[in-house]
């Protein structure tokens, strides 16, 4: 069986696609797996804020188009970049085991930043929460791949940049992490640290294959967080975060807890339920 995996062309996206390819080969050594790297508008236009070109959804749209028109069989995304609603004809067929959900600083620890220091981030969610924690800081926009972001932290006009900790772990750059922020302090982006593996909804054979790399607890947490985002009527650009965890009392039932900040001030919500509908 041949499986073509569509992904963005960035080093992190390629790592993620190669990781899923490895999981599939482990599940079925006879598979012929090919990674198809695509350039997306979000990757090409790093000179403008994401909000001006359609938000984080621009990273997913062109990769999803490759699925819908038959150029690829599977798409691998950072789950945090996906809008809350999946396009008609596609399905998130697998969520592999999730990585680190936390945000992190490169360049300086949060508590050590002096008043009026500059923190670079392209995320409204991160900016809102950091401004709530440290209203004395200043913020600048940040775009580009991880190498660009790390380089930005070394410039004289920026004192720290905010990244997803998991990205540096996956790229072998964990030694550049200066301050990893607990999820209780800095609520992560919905589905941060998770991968979403999409395929066409009518491809029964491929859906069965992808079910073999599913991680049940990660899926339940990601589904709960995405349901939270959907209820807010937002997409992945909404300045709201959520972190769901499977409570140890009854793992099979999938109870979870979540919290989320929103941009008009910071509103934090903690809740518990037995499924995404309760969240």
List where the protein language model places each region.
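Small-molecule-sensing regulatory modules
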Residues: 1-39, 45-48, 52, 136-279
